[in-house]
Amino acid sequence: MVNLFPVFTLIVIITILITTRELSTTMLIVSLVTDYIIINTQYTEQHEMNKFSAQQGLQKNSFDESYNKDKKPNTHISYQWLAPELKEAENKYWWGNDDPYSQPVLAGAS
């Protein structure tokens, strides 16, 4: 269905431009009508996009399926080369000690 509102507003604008002598009134009316047209078309486009995305949401998403299939378990540590240094720091520095009364060794102290 063709929306006849823009055609109607164009006819109204041309009629106003022909009949009205004052430019400020004409420009005010033209700006109000064009603002209304812009807002109306943006609302219509957004409404159409929302309907489209709602229909897409009902279908299966192949990207989600492939992502969940390829996802690695959380037990994988990407910084395994750092594990010995972390173990040494756990034994050496104060944040690895369970005894709150032991002397903390500050990092960077010489």
Curated annotation (Swiss-Prot):
The lineage of its organism: Viruses, Varidnaviria, Bamfordvirae, Nucleocytoviricota, Pokkesviricetes. It is found in: Virion membrane. It is a single-pass membrane protein. One of its GO terms (cellular component) is virion membrane. Induction: Expressed in the late phase of the viral replicative cycle. Belongs to the asfivirus H108R family. This is Inner membrane protein H108R. Its main location: virion. Keywords: Late protein, Membrane, Transmembrane, Transmembrane helix, Virion. Signal peptide: none annotated. The chain crosses the membrane at residues 10-32.
